[in-house]
């Protein structure tokens, strides 16, 4: 059985989670919204065109919307990530980059040349956030060019400047960009918690379970939207 986690600040409240409850202070916590773009959550977006099942995306959008309302009211910083590249795909890397070979978006465009310039390119519909989850005043938007939100981005400096130590993750895909960003945060001494029903995998259902197992066993904690809203929704709104 795990030992109780020592709160990092006096403002912490205990968030029910696996493998044990985790102390979270809203003032030092950010909700990280991973890649809730048309590419990953809308019919006709990259994941859909690449043959992945996105049927769970609508529920994830609904769950994230409720989480963000509570998070903002509790005084948490909300940070949105958008994954993609410039419209010439210079940022994606050429054949000398493993990203060029492993990115399913790039592979899909090579297989279907008519899609070239449309998938995950800034300025295109595919890159844009879904309409239901547009940022609000005070939210932060960041761009990333690889699976991890910490790679070549401003995320670490943005968090440190605000004294943020705990990251709550929502978004798509659990087994790719969510897990990659949480793992890199772990290596930089950030506490990471994923809300399992506010995420969705790219691939079969077993990869969702595997990603959550990895997170709760080795890199962070797993909670639910109900527990998050139940814990922080009762706090007095912060201005």
UniProtKB/Swiss-Prot annotation:
GO terms for biological process: nitrogen utilization; uracil catabolic process. Its EC number is 3.5.1.110. This is Ureidoacrylate amidohydrolase RutB. The active site is at 35 (proton acceptor), 144, 177 (nucleophile). Hydrolyzes ureidoacrylate to form aminoacrylate and carbamate. The carbamate hydrolyzes spontaneously, thereby releasing one of the nitrogen atoms of the pyrimidine ring as ammonia and one of its carbon atoms as CO2. The keyword Hydrolase applies. CDD domains: cysteine_hydrolases. Pfam families: Isochorismatase. One of its GO terms (molecular function) is hydrolase activity, acting on carbon-nitrogen (but not peptide) bonds, in linear amides. It catalyses: (Z)-3-ureidoacrylate + H2O + H(+) = (Z)-3-aminoacrylate + NH4(+) + CO2; (Z)-3-ureidoacrylate + H2O = (Z)-3-aminoacrylate + carbamate + H(+); (Z)-2-methylureidoacrylate + H2O + H(+) = (Z)-2-methylaminoacrylate + NH4(+) + CO2. The keyword Hydrolase applies. Belongs to the isochorismatase family. RutB subfamily. Keywords: Hydrolase.
